[in-house]
């Protein structure tokens, strides 16, 4: 079902572009025109053209106050969300931290977690919270690529003292979730988020959603999700609503606040500091210094250009996908250029 550079001009006519069904039911998306949302339709069309010509975008959704205001590409097509998976896992953690099933202060050693070749005594002191914030100090090889621990000597950094983007941490956080809750990550996602939110394009088949990675490097594998842009946006909308959906708490509000608060600040000359003020618990917090409307904004982030951006000040969620992967990525600067241009379409 294709939507191409679509602004909702009215409820019955999408300029002949979209064949999107009216999914404004109990859990579906309602629509809103740019004018109703306070945005300029002409500028949004220009934004779409600019995005197409200056990024690897394949689909995106901008929702305002829970209603889709702008969409581009096939927003129903699932593809890998890469490291946005970590933010999804943090959402699943919330209820179990709240009810005491997961104790963030428990250590890797106390949980009996080890890995190929064993862990050093100092590494066993890393806590569950250290894993979520990527501050474990455990630089064991990861089963999945994309971390920044290559060349770091094991046993040299005490846990909780230094942020290093570390896929070993994130993968072990998945192991901890299953160990302490007794639930498969994908089954928990389906039961606790997909069904109550009414995600429309998720395929729960175990052939697609399964643990993956190089088991010769680590026992702790990755948990990759395949989601569409509109389903990514709905996860963001749940976060924007402080975890409440149809009157039910799916993710505790205090957990959302904790995860989206800076734990590890980014400061120059760190190149991330231009775009992010820091890292929380599996969420990236936006640098709003030059864009006050982004105060309090945060995002899930995946390789090659996958984003679930939540902008509370504007009641907006912006889901962005570059499904072309390495062949046609959207890197940080192009993405933020697009984000700033989207903000400029406000009246």
Task: Walk through the language-model features, giving the residues of each.
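A short, well-structured edge-of-sheet supersecondary motif
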Residues: 41-75, 308-309, 315-319
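Active-site SXXK
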Residues: 66, 80-105, 131, 173-177, ...
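Active-site-proximal alpha-helical segments within enzyme catalytic domains
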Residues: 87, 172-176, 223-244, 306-322
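Active-site Gly/Thr loop motif
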Residues: 201, 206, 261-317
């Amino acid at each position: 079902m294709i939507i191409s550079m679509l602004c909702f001009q009215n409820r019955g006519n999408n300029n002949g572009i979209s064949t999107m069904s009216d999914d404004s039911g109990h859990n579906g998306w309602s629509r809103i025109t740019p004018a109703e949302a306070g945005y300029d339709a002409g500028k949004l069309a220009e934004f779409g053209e600019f995005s197409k010509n200056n990024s690897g975008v394949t689909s995106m959704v901008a929702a305002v106050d829970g209603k889709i205001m702008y969409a581009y590409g096939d927003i129903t097509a699932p593809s890998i969300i890469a490291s946005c998976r970590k933010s999804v896992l943090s959402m699943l953690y919330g209820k179990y931290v709240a009810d005491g099933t997961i104790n963030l202060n428990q250590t890797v050693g106390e949980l009996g977690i080890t890995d190929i070749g064993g862990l050093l005594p100092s590494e066993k002191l890393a806590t569950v919270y250290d894993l979520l914030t990527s501050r474990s100090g455990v630089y064991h090889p990861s089963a999945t690529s994309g971390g920044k621990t290559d060349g770091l000597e094991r046993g040299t950094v005490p846990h909780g003292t230094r942020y290093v983007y570390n896929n070993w941490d994130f993968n072990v956080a998945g192991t901890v979730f299953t160990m302490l809750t007794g639930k498969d990550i994908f089954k928990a996602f389906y039961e606790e988020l997909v069904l109550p939110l009414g995600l429309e394009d998720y395929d729960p088949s175990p052939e697609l959603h399964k643990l993956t990675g190089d088991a010769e490097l680590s026992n702790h594998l990755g948990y990759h999700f395949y989601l569409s842009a509109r389903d990514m946006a709905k996860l963001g909308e749940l976060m924007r609503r402080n975890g409440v959906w149809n009157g039910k708490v799916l993710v505790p509000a205090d957990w959302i606040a904790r995860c989206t608060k800076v734990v590890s600040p980014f400061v120059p000359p760190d190149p991330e500091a231009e775009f992010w003020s820091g890292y929380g618990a599996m969420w990236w917090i936006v640098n709003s210094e030059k864009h006050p409307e982004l105060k309090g904004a945060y995002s899930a982030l995946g390789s090659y250009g996958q984003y679930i951006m939540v902008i509370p000040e504007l009641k907006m969620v912006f889901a962005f996908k570059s499904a072309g992967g390495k062949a046609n990525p959207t890197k940080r600067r192009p993405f933020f250029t697009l984000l700033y241009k989207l903000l400029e379409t406000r009246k």
